[in-house]
Swiss-Prot record:
UniProt xrefs under PROSITE patterns: FKBP_PPIASE
Molecular function as annotated in GO: peptidyl-prolyl cis-trans isomerase activity; protein folding chaperone; ribosome binding
InterPro entries for this protein: PPIase_dom_sf, PPIase_FKBP_dom, Trig_fac, Trigger_fac_C, Trigger_fac_C_sf, Trigger_fac_ribosome-bd_bac, Trigger_fac_ribosome-bd_sf, Trigger_fact/SurA_dom_sf
E.C. code: 5.2.1.8
Family from the record: Belongs to the FKBP-type PPIase family. Tig subfamily.
An annotated GO BP: chaperone-mediated protein folding
Location relative to the cell: Cytoplasm
Pfam family, one: Trigger_N
Name of the encoding gene: tig
Coiled-coil residues: none
Major subcellular location class: cytoplasm
GO cellular component terms given for this protein: cytoplasm
Protein name, as recorded: Trigger factor
């Protein structure tokens, strides 16, 4: 076997493989011999048909099978011979197999980039320390109260307000014609301010009184998910049929007990604060990690294999799809396409692939490994997050070796990041209060 490598880039190679004619002949003969044992040809007993007839009848089938067999048996050896650390599946371009000459094919492959040793020690970093405020705790309490809110008829007649629950009839017209995506509705339940139809629609309903009919126009944004509505001005005729207001439960110990094993409102507040602060702590860690990668990317340069980018992009799109599915939504219903999302998140996928490559380089560079004790700690951490016994989690992973490999690598990446930060100068800073808030989960 003769193998040559054509460089298309630092990470993209084309292997040109030539298999000698004597090997081709041997495999073809073996292929026809195998066919001869089972072929049913009129006038001949199994195994007795002449080779000339077999070649005439089964040439295409045997040549196709032998081509595949030659590629499958030779490609791993060719990759090992050239010491290539490939990523993903090769793209094969075979020649036409012939009995008279060698068999050749090319395999386009991607390889992991060769990254020089990275000097990751002595980075200067700033870790933002976010703190949960009393106002944020109060906001979460309000959200919890809304979960138990009751609707009741307004005590005294008044105009509709934000947050009211209204029942309305409406008609929608575009140039005087009905709108397919907004069919006429009777007894439509509208929470004013929710934007169920459009925020501007809700604003027009505010101020109406029960029994009133109002006609108004709403111009939908060009980016609206409905092609029928996007950029168009729709005329609505709305009749307010009834109005209820939201009554929140009192904020007391009894309320707290409805959200978990809390003996008092103060205990619930403490749990909310802990969860919010946990979210802020994660945000601070994430921003610190971003600084690490920004600093390390300035110290090295390399190409990223498209296979890795596509793998990260597939993960992002799968997560989006799962999120939409949880709310019974779809890309089509929201006016989005997989192609548009792929373009939108491609830079994110490239960045994630670079992160993995950098950490993998440092892991190899420092000869890091995960001990049995560290793996056990990983099981404990997963068990705690899932609310499951550690033994059950351990048993699951022991029955799934591939998942253990994934867990080990995840733990290795965390270990590498921890070592990088420990070797850095980290200044704790108070973040800009005008920056967007990111809070944790509520109780």
């Amino acid at each position: 076997m003769h193998v040559t490598v054509e460089d298309q880039s630092t990470i993209k190679k084309v292997l040109h493989v030539e298999i000698p004619v004597e090997v081709v002949s041997r495999e073809l003969n073996a292929g026809f011999d195998q066919i001869r044992k089972t072929a049913k040809i009129k006038g001949f007993r199994p195994g007795k048909a002449p080779m000339s007839m077999l070649k005439r009848l089964y040439k295409d089938q045997v040549h196709a099978d032998v081509s595949i067999q030659l590629i499958q048996s030779s490609l791993p050896n060719a990759i090992r011979e050239k010491a290539l650390n490939i990523i993903g599946d090769p793209q094969i371009n075979p020649s036409v197999l012939s009995e008279e000459g060698p068999f050749t094919y090319s395999a386009t492959i991607e390889i992991k980039p060769e990254i020089d040793d990275i000097d990751f020690k002595g980075l200067t970093l700033k870790k933002p320390l976010y703190a949960c405020t009393d106002e944020e705790v109060d906001h979460q309490l309000t959200l919890l109260r809304k979960n138990l809110a009751k609707l009741q008829d307004i005590a005294e007649p008044r105009p509709a307000q934000e947050k009211d629950a209204a029942i309305i009839d409406y008609q929608a017209r575009l140039d005087g014609q009905p709108v397919a995506d907004l069919p006429d509705e009777q007894e439509f339940h509208l929470r004013i301010g929710s934007g169920a139809i459009d925020k501007t629609f809700d604003q027009q309903v505010v101020g109406m009184t029960v029994g009133e009919t109002r006609t108004f126009e709403v111009t939908f944004p060009e980016t609206h998910g409905s092609k029928t509505l996007a950029g168009n001005t729709i005329s609505f005729t709305v009749t307010l049929k009834s109005l209820k207001e939201e009554i929140l439960p009192e904020l007391n110990d009894e309320l707290a007990a409805q959200f978990g094993p809390f003996d008092s409102l103060d205990q619930l507040k403490t749990e909310i604060r802990k969860n919010l602060q946990s979210g802020y702590d994660r945000r601070g860690e994430q921003e610190l990690h971003e600084q690490v990668f920004t600093a390390l990317l300035e110290k090295t340069s390399f190409e990223v294999p498209e296979t890795m980018v596509q793998h990260e992009l597939d993960g992002i799109l799968d997560e989006i799809d799962r999120t939409y599915s949880a709310y019974n939504l779809s890309l089509e219903a929201l006016g989005q396409t997989k192609e548009a999302l792929s373009e939108k998140y491609r830079d994110t996928a490239v960045k994630q692939a670079k992160r993995h490559l950098i950490l993998n380089k440092i892991i190899d560079q420092e000869k890091m490994a995960i001990s049995d004790d560290e793996l056990a700690e990983g099981f404990e951490s997963i068990a705690k997050s899932m609310g499951q016994p550690a033994d059950m989690v351990k048993q699951y992973y022991q029955g799934n070796p591939e998942q253990i490999d994934v867990l080990r690598y995840t733990l290795l990446e965390k270990k590498a990041m921890r070592i990088i930060i420990e070797g850095s100068t980290v200044e704790e800073v108070t973040p800009d209060p005008s920056s967007p808030d990111t809070a944790g989960d509520q109780a």
